[in-house]
Structures are given as C-alpha cells and as structure tokens.
C-alpha cells in the first residue's frame, strides 16, 4: 500500500476503537465507532457540522445531565439552599468557578495555537480509554497548559 493511500486518521480511529473496547469504555467505543462509520460513508459530509457544533451540543447534553436532579426534584430546593451554608459546597462552587475560568482560557489557547490541539486530544482520549476518565478534559487541559505557558 502506498503511503499516499494510507489513511492515518482512520488508523487512529481504529486504535481508539480498540482502546475503548479493551478498556470497556463505552464513550470512546461509541464515539470512535460512529466516527468510523461517518468517515467510511457519505455521512462524512457532516464532519464540518460536527466540528462546528459538536462541542456545544456535547456541553449542552452534559449540562442537561447535571441539572436533571434539580428539574426532577431529586435534589430539593431546600437541599440546594442549604448547600450555600456548607463549607464543602462553598468549596465546590469555588472549584466550579476556577474550572469554568480554565475552560475559557483553554478555548482561547486552542484557538490561538492549533498546533497543541492534537496533543491535548491524544492525552484526553488516552485518559478516557486507559484511565477510565471522562472526555471533558481538552478545554480544562488547555486552560492549565495556558497557565503553564504563561499565555
């Protein structure tokens, strides 16, 4: 097979699929599998849409998941109000503010220095596949990197 015919991106997706299966990580397995199907079919025409809106849609779905206990009543209004008087909850609010700030810095860094995106993605996917992490890391990782780089 000629190097010009060799699709490194497909190989990476296949390796990620294998990592997801091996580590029993459904998120990586499903994501890699879906992207392989898109890549090998006419669905590939939707890649620009996924690239432009995928992150926002993912954040919206994640936020819906986080807010569902409030909407369903599983987390009562009384419990929410009491949380403002607990040192653990106040610390959690502070950490949440810090993480949101880091995510904002991460978006700026990834936009201004696209050469680091591949490394951040590889690190995040490896963390998800091998360490059973959750794929919310690239923005936060980029935010932390922006602090390390003094950017």
Curated annotation (Swiss-Prot):
Q: Where are the transmembrane segments?
A: 10-30, 53-73, 84-104, 116-136
Keywords from UniProt, A to Z, are: Cell membrane, Membrane, Transmembrane, Transmembrane helix
Intracellular or extracellular location(s):
Cell membrane
Its GO CC terms are: plasma membrane
Annotated coiled-coil segments of the chain: none
Membrane topology designation? Multi-pass membrane protein
Q: Which domain of life is it from?
A: Bacteria
Chief location category: membrane
Its family remark reads: Belongs to the UPF0756 family.
HAMAP family (UniProt xref) = UPF0756
Q: What is this protein called?
A: UPF0756 membrane protein ACIAD2383
Origin species, per record, is Acinetobacter baylyi (strain ATCC 33305 / BD413 / ADP1)
């Amino acid at each position: 097979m000629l190097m010009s015919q060799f699709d490194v991106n497909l190989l990476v997706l296949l390796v990620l699929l294998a990592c997801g299966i091996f580590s029993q990580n459904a998120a990586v397995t499903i994501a890699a599998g879906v992207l392989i199907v898109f890549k090998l079919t006419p669905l590939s025409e939707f890649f620009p849409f996924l690239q432009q809106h995928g992150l926002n849609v993912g954040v919206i779905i994640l936020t819906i998941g986080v807010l569902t206990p409030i909407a369903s009543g599983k987390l009562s209004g009384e419990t929410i109000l009491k949380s403002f008087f607990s040192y653990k909850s106040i610390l959690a609010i502070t950490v949440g503010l810090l993480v949101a700030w880091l995510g904002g810095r991460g978006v700026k860094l990834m936009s201004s220095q696209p050469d680091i995106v591949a490394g951040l993605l590889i690190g995040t996917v490896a963390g998800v596949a091998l360490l059973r992490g959750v794929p919310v890391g690239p923005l936060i990782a980029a935010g932390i990197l922006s602090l390390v780089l003094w950017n």
